[in-house]
Amino acid sequence: EKVFNKVIAFSDAEINKFSTASLITRSTNDVQQIQMVTVMMLRMVLYAPILSIGGIVKVVGNGAGMGWVIFIGIAAVVILMGTLMVIAMPKFKVMQTLVDRVNLVSREILTGIPVIRAFGREEREEERFDEANKDLTKNTLFVNRVMTFAMPILMFIMYAISILIEWVAAHKIDAGVLQVGSMTAFITYTMLIIMSFLMLSMMSVMLPRASVAADRIQEIIDTDVTVQDAAGAKKLETPRGVVKYDNVAFAYPGADENVLENISFEAKPGQTTAIIGSTGCGKSTLVQLLPRFYDVTEGSITIDGQDIRDLTMESVRQNIGFVPQKGILFSGTIASNIRFGAPDASDEDVKLAAEIAQASDFIEEKEHGYDSAVAQGGGNVSGGQKQRLAIARAIARKPKILIFDDSFSALDFKTDVAVRKALGEHVNDSTVFIVAQRVSTILSADQILVLDEGTIVGKGTHKELMQTCEEYRQIAESQLSPSEIAASLGTDSERQV
């Protein structure tokens, strides 16, 4: 639970550092390794010392004078297990890394099956998985062979000690200084002692892998979360939703150059701020700074004049409705997905959110309507339907700030227009951000920011930018026909969102 809670608290920077596949392995397989060893320790660690101590007491009391034989046996067991641990420990470390690799490849293949099939790369991906699996199998077989080799040696030591005792005892019996009964008792007690050390040695076989797993888990626990509440952070109370970026710059952790530079603008309630630009110019990064998926490197972002770093993340995010580029759904029902950010939303609120997102038609066509099941990852709905449900989920929260991170890309033009029109009618007091690739999506925005290589090169309405910003004009002319451009310039004042 502690590991999972820490992972949930990670920002995107920490998640990218470990990778999703590695975090899954560490949160499941590594934890299971420690659980298994803990159970074994509870069973053996108490039982084995009792056997060994009891056996030693009896051997000393027996007076057979063969205690040195026992020490030879114990020394042999300790040397053997120490040698095996030295050989196996590095392989255990490699094994967990290879488990990460197999999980990563499996996850990539399973999520990318449509692309793999479309490009006819099934055979290559099978080879890639086979390669990762063979590496893991090879490493696992080596470790298992080493550990399998240990048991015959341990049994050999136990029987060799028994034979040695009988040989020494035979001479003592022949000399008349030892009774047969004492020899039998001594052998029994010696076997108890050796058996207890065998049990402990079996624990030592499991400890290396558990130790590696513990180190990997501890690495997660010891990792500092870069985005967290400051000491004395305040709650964002009854916000109006005025958002201001003041000379913001941002660089990804470990990067040499800023992704964003000198970003300054203000977004007000009831208005739509659109962001457009070429691929990779920092559009999504800009809006992801607002809910603090990352923290700014320089400058500040404020809501109603309060720096978001001085506010609790929970209170900031509770007032934001975020729709990512790729719609993400969870297993459950359509209603539970729409209520994801607003568990107390009424049935009417859920239906209204679906209507605004233009999702109500396909929902009501289903046999069970809003109670229809949603498969893991939304596998039983189309891309457009998934995106509309994601939009409905954000709207149902009734946030003061709405962020659409290229969320209309999966919608056809007609649905795009209908969604924006409904938003203008029902969500007219929120501060709206729209990241877009299509100029047609943002024609009616109150403010358009044009990004180029991480800086704002244009700011204004569509009509203003067509006159003042060369980059925006090139984008518009590449997407719209002359007649569409003329129509858009003539109707700039008729805004929907």
Describe each region flagged by the PLM.
Residues 9-15, 29-38, 42, 46, ...:
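An intracellular "coupling" helix at the cytosolic face of ABC transporter transmembrane type-1 domains
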Residues 3, 7, 116, 129, ...:
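Helix-loop junctions and hydrophobic alpha-helical segments within the transmembrane domains
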Residues 236-497:
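ABC-type nucleotide-binding domain
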Residues 226-238:
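Pre-NBD coupling/linker segments of ABC/ABC-like ATPases
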Residues 54-79, 85-86, 142-216, 220-221:
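Helix-loop-helix
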Residues 1-22, 42-85, 106, 110, ...:
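Hydrophobic, well-ordered secondary-structure segments
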